[in-house]
């Protein structure tokens, strides 16, 4: 039976392509992840971590850019193509089978992000400025039945040093076993609470 977006809140196993659609993933992402601010008070020099999801980031997190070419398949336009059923598992496989197979597990494990942000292990990353290494200050990771998912986070802007956005999602059968930062408090806040709008007068370079 095909899964609906609400089913993805509590899934316990990696869904099959016959159970899940990218349209459902987009609906789930928009309904349960976007529009909220996930607040974590940490026992760390970065005392507050405020995570926000944006519609235009979903395609990148799923790895669509490794399967399809063209700016219309990423960002907010790409999100619309997922939500309206234009870009599907079938169409991705037809367009680029190798890229599709490389990204398939990432796409199928993505629904675990909801459970991950509600019970994360938070770790710091060494920000590498060279090559194609993702520049991310923090990661959320957790394991599901010996398979691990990781969400890497990057600061939104210098003007809002406590606000972070997801920059990369991955799944793996291995975990690096890094020491976790203690989470003292976590809660869900309105999307823009505490955010300082960037203007020409207050922008930092």
Enumerate the language-model features and the residues they cover.
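An acidic, glycine-rich, mixed-charge low-complexity segment common to nucleic-acid enzymes
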Residues: 1-136, 141, 205
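Conserved binding-pocket/active-site segment within a compact domain
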Residues: 105-201
């Amino acid at each position: 039976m095909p899964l609906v977006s609400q089913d993805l809140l509590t899934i316990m196993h990696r869904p099959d392509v016959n159970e899940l659609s990218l349209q459902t993933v987009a609906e789930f992402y928009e309904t349960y992840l976007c529009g909220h601010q996930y607040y974590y008070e940490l026992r760390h020099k970065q005392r507050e971590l405020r995570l926000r999801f944006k519609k235009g980031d979903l395609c990148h997190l799923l790895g669509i850019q490794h399967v399809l070419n063209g700016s219309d398949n990423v960002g907010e336009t790409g999100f619309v193509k997922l939500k309206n059923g234009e870009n599907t598992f079938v169409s991705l496989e037809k367009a680029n089978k190798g890229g599709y197979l490389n990204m398939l597990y990432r796409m199928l494990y993505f629904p675990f992000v909801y459970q991950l942000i509600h019970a994360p292990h938070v770790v710091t990353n060494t920000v590498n400025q060279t090559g194609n290494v993702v520049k991310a200050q923090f990661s959320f990771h957790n394991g599901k039945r010996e398979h691990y998912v990781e969400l890497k986070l990057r600061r939104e802007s210098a003007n809002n040093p406590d606000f972070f956005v997801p920059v990369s999602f991955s799944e793996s059968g291995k975990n690096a076993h890094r020491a976790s930062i203690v989470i003292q408090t976590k809660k869900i806040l309105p999307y823009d609470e505490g955010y300082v709008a960037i203007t020409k007068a207050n922008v930092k370079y």
